[in-house]
C-alpha cells in the first residue's frame, strides 16, 4: 500500500464480522483498498458479498472490527462520533440508488442545504448550487420540487448535492440502478464528467458491466478480500 498522503481513500487491513445466532459471518477479512485523487473505481461485487458493508466502512457509517480507514491524511480510527460526522461532511459525498431528496424543498434548496450546514452563507450556497445544477443541465429546473422532476433529473440533483461541499471522495451505491437504460447512460455520463472535472476520487457500485468498463479500474469482493475484478 502507498503512503496515505497520496491517497484520497485508504482501507488498511480492514475486518468486519457479524454474528448470526451462534455463527460468525466474516464479510471483510483484513482487506485493503486505496483510491488516489481523481481515480474512479467500479465495485462490481455480487449482492450478499459485502458491497454495502464496504461502502459503509468507507463512508464512516460503520466502524471496522479491525484495521484503519483513512480519508486523505485523516485516520478515522478513534475519532468521536462528532469528529467522524465532521470528517464525513467535509470530505465525503454520497449518491444512492434512490435519490433521497427532500420533497418539500426545491432542487436548488436541496443542493444549498448541505453547504449551509457546512458553514457557507445562503448567498454563497445558492450561487454554487446554481453552478452545479447548470453543469448538469438543470438550471431551468432549479425552482422545481423533486416530485416535479423526472427520475433522471432527480438523480442528477442528488449528484449535484453530493458534490456541493467539494468532497475528496464520492461513494455511490447503484446510482443508476433505478433508471431505464437511456436515462442511466445520461446520468452516468454526467456523474463521470463531474467527478473528473472536480478531481474527485469515486467508488461506484454497479451491476452494469458497460458502466463499470468506463471507469479506471474494477474491484470485487472475494472470500473477504478486495481484489481486481
Curated annotation (Swiss-Prot):
Highest taxon of the lineage: Bacteria
UniProt record, GO biological process: lipoprotein localization to outer membrane; protein localization to outer membrane
Compartments in which it is found: Cell inner membrane
Enzyme class, spelled out: translocase
Membrane topology value: Peripheral membrane protein
Domain ABC transporter: 9-229
Keyword list, A-Z: ATP-binding, Cell inner membrane, Cell membrane, Membrane, Nucleotide-binding, Translocase, Transport
Annotated GO MF terms: ATP binding; ATP hydrolysis activity; transmembrane transporter activity
Residues at which ATP binds: 45-52
EC number: 7.6.2.-
PROSITE patterns: ABC_TRANSPORTER_1, ABC_TRANSPORTER_2, LOLD
UniProt cross-references to CDD domains, sorted A to Z: ABC_MJ0796_LolCDE_FtsE
InterPro entries listed in its UniProt record: AAA+_ATPase (IPR003593), ABC_transporter-like_ATP-bd (IPR003439), ABC_transporter-like_CS (IPR017871), ABC_transpr_LolD-like (IPR015854), MacB-like_ATP-bd (IPR017911), P-loop_NTPase (IPR027417)
GO cellular component labels: plasma membrane
Gene3D superfamilies: P-loop containing nucleotide triphosphate hydrolases
Function: Part of the ABC transporter complex LolCDE involved in the translocation of mature outer membrane-directed lipoproteins, from the inner membrane to the periplasmic chaperone, LolA. Responsible for the formation of the LolA-lipoprotein complex in an ATP-dependent manner.
PANTHER family reported for this sequence: IMPORT ATP-BINDING PROTEIN, LIPOPROTEIN-RELEASING SYSTEM ATP-BINDING PROTEIN LOLD
Assembly mode: The complex is composed of two ATP-binding proteins (LolD) and two transmembrane proteins (LolC and LolE).
Family: Belongs to the ABC transporter superfamily. Lipoprotein translocase (TC 3.A.1.125) family.
Name used for this protein in its record: Lipoprotein-releasing system ATP-binding protein LolD
Gene name of the encoded protein: lolD
Amino acid at each position: 500500500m502507498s503512503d496515505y498522503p497520496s491517497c484520497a481513500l485508504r482501507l488498511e487491513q480492514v475486518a468486519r464480522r457479524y454474528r448470526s445466532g451462534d455463527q460468525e459471518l466474516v464479510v471483510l477479512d483484513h482487506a485493503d483498498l486505496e483510491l488516489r485523487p481523481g481515480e474512479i473505481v467500479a465495485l462490481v461485487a455480487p449482492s450478499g458479498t459485502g458491497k454495502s458493508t464496504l461502502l459503509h466502512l468507507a463512508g464512516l457509517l460503520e466502524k471496522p472490527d479491525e484495521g484503519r480507514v483513512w480519508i486523505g491524511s485523516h485516520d478515522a480510527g478513534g475519532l468521536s462520533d462528532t469528529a467522524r460526522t465532521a470528517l464525513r461532511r467535509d470530505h465525503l459525498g454520497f449518491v444512492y440508488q434512490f435519490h433521497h431528496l427532500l420533497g418539500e424543498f426545491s432542487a436548488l434548496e436541496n443542493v444549498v442545504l448541505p453547504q449551509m450546514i457546512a458553514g457557507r452563507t445562503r448567498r454563497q450556497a445558492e450561487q454554487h448550487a446554481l453552478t452545479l445544477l447548470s453543469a448538469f443541465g438543470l438550471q431551468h429546473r432549479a425552482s422545481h420540487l423533486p416530485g416535479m422532476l423526472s427520475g433522471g433529473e432527480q438523480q442528477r440533483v442528488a449528484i449535484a448535492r453530493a458534490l456541493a461541499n467539494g468532497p475528496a471522495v464520492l461513494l455511490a451505491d447503484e446510482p443508476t440502478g433505478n433508471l431505464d437504460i437511456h436515462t442511466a447512460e445520461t446520468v452516468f455520463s454526467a456523474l463521470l464528467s463531474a467527478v473528473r472535472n472536480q478531481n474527485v476520487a469515486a467508488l461506484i457500485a454497479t451491476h452494469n458491466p458497460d458502466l463499470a468498463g468506463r471507469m479506471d479500474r474494477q474491484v470485487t469482493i472475494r472470500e473477504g478480500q478486495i481484489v481486481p475484478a
